[in-house]
Amino acid sequence: MKIMRKTHPLMKMVNHAFIDLPAPVNISGWWNFGSLIGLCLIIQIASGLFLAMHYTADTTTAFSSVAHICRDVNYGWLIRSMHANGASLFFVCLYLHIGRGIYYGSYLYKETWNVGILLLFMVMATAFMGYVLPWGQMSFWGATVITNLLSAIPYIGPDLVEWIWGGFSVDKATLTRFFAFHFILPFIIAAMAMVHLLFLHETGSNNPLGIPSNCDKIPFHPYYTFKDLLGVMILLGLYLTLVLFFPDLLGDPDNYMPANPLNTPPHIKPEWYFLFAYAILRSIPNKLGGVIALVLSILVLALFPLLHTSNQRSLTFRPISQFLFWILVSDLFILTWIGGQPVEPPFIMIGQVASILYFSIILILLPIAGLIENKILKW
């Protein structure tokens, strides 16, 4: 009898991707985050769908519709809390996934890496637009400040901003289109994630040693399905603890006030997962320069394959590069902290130094470290 999973056209695809997929024997827990991001995306789409059933994308009723979800809809408070905190967990998994890619040299799979960068931009855009939807104070002012940055683009900037707003300020048209985009983008992200996987399965997974593992592979199921399941259990434990015990820990209290165009909050800041980029934006006293630095802070990831100078793929046996990598991680924590602070001394200077260090490590120090390590190993 033929095995159905190996012959059925649809199941054959699933089989090649998740069951009979040859996987390196030595991949560690850092390889769990891909599946965890997938889980986060499923949770976000499911919870978002139920929220969209009760939400109204209108400036007069958006805020009260969110209050209605929390008060009157069965388990609405839970669905909203899951969706809001699910975004935070999504970004935690994303950043750890990217960090893993940098540490172990996974960026040398150029197609997979570039699709990943595109996915990151799409997830960031989706999260930003989602933050605008509750129409609280920080939603409104965050949308105003961030969309206004586009006015720094020479010549077309001001027209571009008005085109995105659908008027002369952030208003009903802006909210409606943001809701439409926020709804459709996750499905495009899911499709792009499939492309990401397609490219990955063309080459096979990398491993902690950064060496070819074709001679030593094991099937994905049952070994890595159960390993991923452990990651899922840990993630869900952390997730439910956050959702049920500390639902407002990562939110901004200002967003519990309805949007008021006549009253600016004392400190306008995005959600915690954008603070590092926000700090880089603010560290440059020129508007256009700040916007360029903001885009480059993410786009610089695309340069990793080009700036790889070492003869070894991963950082496992490269102590100088390891040291720089962890300095970079610390620097990102500092930038995240600075992004949430007011624009005053000493925070301005700390932010500027941290921003310079961020780009210096990636563009200058890591490539030099790779060359030095080659020399030390006489390669």
Curated annotation (Swiss-Prot):
Binding site for heme b b562: H83, H182
Protein name: Cytochrome b
MF-aspect GO terms: metal ion binding; ubiquinol-cytochrome-c reductase activity
Pfam families: Cytochrom_B_C (PF00032), Cytochrome_B (PF00033)
UniProt keyword terms in alphabetical order: Electron transport, Heme, Iron, Membrane, Metal-binding, Mitochondrion, Mitochondrion inner membrane, Respiratory chain, Transmembrane, Transmembrane helix, Transport, Ubiquinone
Residues annotated for a ubiquinone binding in this entry: H201
Function of the molecule: Component of the ubiquinol-cytochrome c reductase complex (complex III or cytochrome b-c1 complex) that is part of the mitochondrial respiratory chain. The b-c1 complex mediates electron transfer from ubiquinol to cytochrome c. Contributes to the generation of a proton gradient across the mitochondrial membrane that is then used for ATP synthesis.
Principal subcellular localisation of the protein: mitochondrion
Cofactor comment text: Binds 2 heme b groups non-covalently.
Gene3D superfamilies: Cytochrome Bc1 Complex, Chain C
Cofactor(s) named in the record: heme b
Binding residues annotated for heme b b566, in chain numbering: H97, H196
Transmembrane segments: 33-53, 77-98, 113-133, 178-198, 226-246, 288-308, 320-340, 347-367
Organism the protein comes from: Liomys spectabilis
Keyword Transport in record: yes
Family (UniProt): Belongs to the cytochrome b family.
Subunit-structure text: The cytochrome bc1 complex contains 11 subunits: 3 respiratory subunits (MT-CYB, CYC1 and UQCRFS1), 2 core proteins (UQCRC1 and UQCRC2) and 6 low-molecular weight proteins (UQCRH/QCR6, UQCRB/QCR7, UQCRQ/QCR8, UQCR10/QCR9, UQCR11/QCR10 and a cleavage product of UQCRFS1). This cytochrome bc1 complex then forms a dimer.
Highest rank taxon of the organism: Eukaryota
Localization, UniProt: Mitochondrion inner membrane
UniProt GO cellular component terms: mitochondrial inner membrane; respiratory chain complex III
Gene (name only): MT-CYB
Note: Heme 1 (or BL or b562) is low-potential and absorbs at about 562 nm, and heme 2 (or BH or b566) is high-potential and absorbs at about 566 nm.
Keyword Phosphoprotein (UniProt): no
Bilayer topology annotation: Multi-pass membrane protein
UniProt-listed GO biological process terms: mitochondrial electron transport, ubiquinol to cytochrome c
